[in-house]
Amino acid sequence: MKKNTHLDYKQVLFVDSSTGYKFVCGSTYQSDKTEVFEGQEYPVCYVSVSSSSHPFFTGSKRLVDAEGRVDKFLKRYSNVKPAQPVQVAEEPVAKGKKKPSLKKKK
């Protein structure tokens, strides 16, 4: 078995950036930033949504996402011009000619 393949599992401080709620949970997350929480120093992970801010857990219909997927899409494609419709020339059908039958002849 290879040695040193697994990351270190340690206690990490998670901070909800929208509400400021803090909680400690075991994780393999690695961070250079640290904070003191309840007398101990922990690596910090900032999350945009947690149980204190998610509408399912809070029961409110508050907008959680500050800059979501729709905003990114609109920002990316707001300067794009709509494509011009392609004009297809139709071939005139000669009158009196029948179209070939698709049935097999015996």
From Swiss-Prot:
Source organism (scientific name): Chlamydia felis (strain Fe/C-56)
UniProt keyword annotations, A-Z: Ribonucleoprotein, Ribosomal protein
Domain of life: Bacteria
Protein name per the record: Large ribosomal subunit protein bL31B
S-S bridge residues: none
GO molecular function: structural constituent of ribosome
Biased composition (Basic residues): 95-106
Cited PANTHER family: 50S RIBOSOMAL PROTEIN L31, CHLOROPLASTIC, LARGE RIBOSOMAL SUBUNIT PROTEIN BL31C
